[in-house]
Amino acid sequence: MNESDKIIQRSQLPLLGAYVEPRSPTEKKLAEVWRRALGMDRIGITDSYEDLGGDSLLAASIIAELETSFGTKMPWALLADAGTIEQMAATIDNLKEGAK
C-alpha cells in the first residue's frame, strides 16, 4: 500500500536495480516464466526473486513449469540457492550439460 492506503501492483513498483535483459535461451525462458508467475511486465536477469515478491508457493509452480520446459528434474532449492535469473540459468545449463 502507498501513503494514501491504495494498493500498489507489483508491476508498478520501481525496479530494484538496473535492468539487464536476458541474453541466452535459458535466461529468456526463465524471464518469461518468472514474469507470468509474478505478474510483472519485465524482469531482468539480475533481479532477485525474493525482492520481487516471490514466495514458496510461486516457487513450486515455477519449478514444475521449468521441469516441463527443460525436460530436466530441477532441485526444489533452485530458486532459493540461485536467487536471480542469471544464477539460475547457469545452474540449469550445468544440469542439462550433466544429463548428457
Segments and roles (model prediction):
Residues M1-K100:
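Phosphopantetheine-dependent thiolation modules in NRPS/PKS and related acyl-activating systems
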